[in-house]
């Protein structure tokens, strides 16, 4: 199957079966999204959604975060992965937002990756979800699904390479949603271990299914 046709079929299925939501994280503004995404690194969205209500209630603004300490934030997020590091990142992020961005979350990649705890993946999520930009975050799910479906060549061995390869074929208006679609497919269907190929809409043309690699 030609690459363009493969992308067309995959994206057509996602568009017709998935809603327009772009994250399972709960948030009400760009600041809350930034906090939630920083916390979500190597942790489940379900867990993050359990700790953020109290965190957002008591620290609703960058100013509030900047005025507290990592030790205080730790008590709110101690059930997530790497709570000490993330507590420091959040307080540092609050301070930088106040000191350099007027208390507002910036919208460009260059500015976002300057924030403590924010790398390219996190920045792309914020750009796409909070600001509607054509940015595609590549996490482990997106990376795995992209390779298994043959959307990207084997030579794409880094998240950045996968991001660039995907964006060559995904229409600009679907780049943001595609991150979430691929993520959900990897999270619930094309899982790392024992993928559910029997219910996968792409099984008939998935090279991993045909060659049996997806069952390893």
Where in this protein do the model-derived segments appear?
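Catalytic cores of DNA base-excision repair glycosylases
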Residues: 2-215
């Amino acid at each position: 199957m030609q690459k363009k046709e493969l992308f067309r079929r995959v994206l057509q299925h996602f568009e017709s079966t998935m809603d327009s939501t772009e994250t399972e994280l709960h948030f009400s503004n760009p600041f809350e999204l930034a906090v939630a995404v920083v916390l979500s690194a190597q942790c489940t969205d379900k867990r993050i959604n359990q700790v953020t209500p109290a965190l957002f209630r008591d620290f609703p603004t960058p100013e509030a975060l900047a005025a507290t300490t990592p030790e205080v934030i730790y008590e709110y997020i101690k059930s997530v992965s790497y709570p000490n590091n993330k507590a420091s990142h959040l307080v540092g992020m609050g301070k930088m937002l106040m000191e350099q961005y007027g208390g507002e979350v910036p919208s460009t990649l260059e500015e976002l990756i300057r924030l403590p705890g924010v790398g390219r993946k996190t920045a792309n999520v914020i750009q796409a979800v909070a600001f509607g930009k054509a940015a595609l975050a590549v996490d482990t799910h997106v990376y795995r699904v992209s390779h298994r479906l043959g959307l990207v060549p084997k030579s794409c061995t880094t998240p950045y390479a996968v991001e660039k390869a995907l964006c060559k074929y995904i229409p600009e208006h679907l780049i943001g949603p595609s991150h979430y679609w691929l993520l959900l497919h990897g999270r619930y269907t094309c899982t790392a271990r024992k993928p559910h190929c029997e219910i996968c809409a792409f099984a008939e043309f998935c090279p991993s299914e045909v060659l049996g690699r997806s069952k390893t």
